[in-house]
From Swiss-Prot, chains A, B, C:
The keyword Protein biosynthesis appears for this protein: no
Superkingdom of this protein's organism: Archaea
Binding site for substrate: 48, 210
UniProt protein name: Hydroxyethylthiazole kinase 1
Family, similarity comment: Belongs to the Thz kinase family.
EC number in record: 2.7.1.50
Gene: thiM1
Top class in the EC scheme: transferase
Pathway of action: Cofactor biosynthesis; thiamine diphosphate biosynthesis; 4-methyl-5-(2-phosphoethyl)-thiazole from 5-(2-hydroxyethyl)-4-methylthiazole: step 1/1
Cofactor(s) this protein requires: Mg(2+)
NCBIfam families xref list: PRK09355.1
Amino acid sequence: MSEYTLENIAQVVEILREKSPLTHCITNVVTVKDCANAVLAVGASPIMANAPEEAEEIVGISNSLVINIGTLTKEQIETMKKSAKFAIENNKPFILDPVGVGISNIRNQTPIDIITNSKPSIIRGNLSEIKAIAMMYDILDECTMAKGVDVAQCDIINKDTLISNCNLIKNISEKLNTTIAVSGPIDIISDGHDVYTIENGDAMMSRITGSGCMLGCVLGAYLAVTNPLEAAITGTLVMGIAGELAAKTARDNNKGTGSFGIYLIDELSKLNKSTILSQSKLNKM
Amino acid sequence: MSEYTLENIAQVVEILREKSPLTHCITNVVTVKDCANAVLAVGASPIMANAPEEAEEIVGISNSLVINIGTLTKEQIETMKKSAKFAIENNKPFILDPVGVGISNIRNQTPIDIITNSKPSIIRGNLSEIKAIAMMYDILDECTMAKGVDVAQCDIINKDTLISNCNLIKNISEKLNTTIAVSGPIDIISDGHDVYTIENGDAMMSRITGSGCMLGCVLGAYLAVTNPLEAAITGTLVMGIAGELAAKTARDNNKGTGSFGIYLIDELSKLNKSTILSQSKLNKM
Amino acid sequence: MSEYTLENIAQVVEILREKSPLTHCITNVVTVKDCANAVLAVGASPIMANAPEEAEEIVGISNSLVINIGTLTKEQIETMKKSAKFAIENNKPFILDPVGVGISNIRNQTPIDIITNSKPSIIRGNLSEIKAIAMMYDILDECTMAKGVDVAQCDIINKDTLISNCNLIKNISEKLNTTIAVSGPIDIISDGHDVYTIENGDAMMSRITGSGCMLGCVLGAYLAVTNPLEAAITGTLVMGIAGELAAKTARDNNKGTGSFGIYLIDELSKLNKSTILSQSKLNKM
């Protein structure tokens, strides 16, 4: 229940660059390269492996694990379950990114299996995804169906819905006994006790594929060097600030979404202590 | 058999940005991220899913479907067949991009199965691919083998071969009872009645991977908001114009093919009504 | 045992652009698009296919083959074995890139099977990977475990360890009867008789994913037009020079690793005879 200052966060950013932990990402085929480059850009060392035959060996040498269900296959689901189980048995922290949960049966069953059998350190997603998870655990009675892998229109967090959503996320986090990181125009992070909001970021982030997936992998990298709540705050700030700076560069140079995606990795790779201290819009509720 | 004006096309471009339909792409692992970013750039919302277990659920929530056979696996072939069948039964338009048809048995059998059992709204490809399809349906007696996934040298459409190729494409389109979109230095599009040609584009587009795949997915996005012929014309114009503008920027700044690929997404994301009206080189034959 | 001059190398660079051979890459899902774009950038024509059902057909039409084990699946392992066997039976040169060998059982068994049953023309990797291969063939008694898919700290080649590592690589190459290309701050290439070192490149190359994978595919492209030793020297010089120029552009413009990755493809696509002659840092030991 400690309070995290920007000084703490800036330190975590630097520690990751010093320690360069091995971050294992079992993720989708759409954005896997951007995920690897994002992990490298913030200073960690990524590995991506999908075969169930090597699941335990790879988790065994890794410092943390990311599970992103964006493009599941039967084989990958097996790898995810084995990896999550092995991670929890060996005290390796891991994050679950339940992309598109709520829109198909395997996108519901895979997260349920992983959450129930191998409690993740962090679950991250957009509000529609987190609500879909909450509904499956009877924490919520109803939720709006997401638009594919994107958030439902009514689940976009704004000033008016912030307080109620903060309470909701705190409640879900407490019930599931895990840290929850929700991304949106305003990000909400809770460990069931405290709630933080972050107002960094830019709307351009939702005009490219991979912003959410990269965030999940960056959180996974920070999980290797600090506790889940601080990892979630740090990674969300880092991605939000990088997104903001990248969008500014894209607009200033009359570029579109292609260049924005490249500038985002640029900013992640250049980001340091002073960027965190000067740019962060972090609030404790 | 209506005639499409640039005003019509420009309207379709704007309608896609307003409606942002969900475009489901079952596509190859090489260019899948560029496909998602291209769909986002023109204003639609992409989803990529490969598991047969969720095929019907994902098609069920999507507004249109793209099937690209670039890197087939046994599992993905099953997903494609189920998805195409479900799409046709539920009146969801879909486009088939038979990448490399003619070079292997599974690249022949998969399109045949899909075309025969679940008529696509559009089939798009380079001339070698479309001729390979035509030969399998006894519309053509012979064709030149493509160079891998690239067009055969003798199948590059130019001024001299334009008329005969237009007649050929119209004939194939009529026989297969579907819209055909052939890309090349001059693009040819026919619904079996009318034939349109487009002279936008740049040779640099064939020096990166994914130009054809992105085109297929962009056509798929427009399929969600208009009829196959207009969708094919609109998407082909949009990609061609974006390619032209991106190549100019790359050359003006002494950049190579890496930057060109990024500028292409930039231009897709910036393209609007006035770009269409001022840049289009569309002819009705 | 001939000596390769920069004139020879520059000629190979030009011949690849003229002949544009079909280069088949069975590679990982992380960097597959960059691999295709790198192959296109140096002038060859890439094809990527993973299904065992079409393995022999695709190798049959290809001029050379690349096998990269970065993200193995059961199906892909089958494709690799069939493809390697068919390549060797049909005198198609191929290169093996044993990504992460030493860190899991399938990453050990797959290269062993391929090396033993279908001798590759080139094996390329970082020093940790090549040492792991050597240990499995009893050429070395011990080696340091790599850090995931990255080189172990103690295996980074520098001035002090250069001579001993050159001798080691020459020995491994002789014993395995294949050309070995080791990448690092100083690259070492040997065919068991001669040893060449290359000091081009930039540290930024290890801050993005895919530098090694792209190198493997570029070597594969050159394998289609010359012998393994000259192909390895040419491809390593080409990638190193492109990396150096790209890093300079990134630094001069205060860009990060995202832009660097794009500039790398730019430089590969612009590289010509005069770049080779003016920039190469090639030494025969």
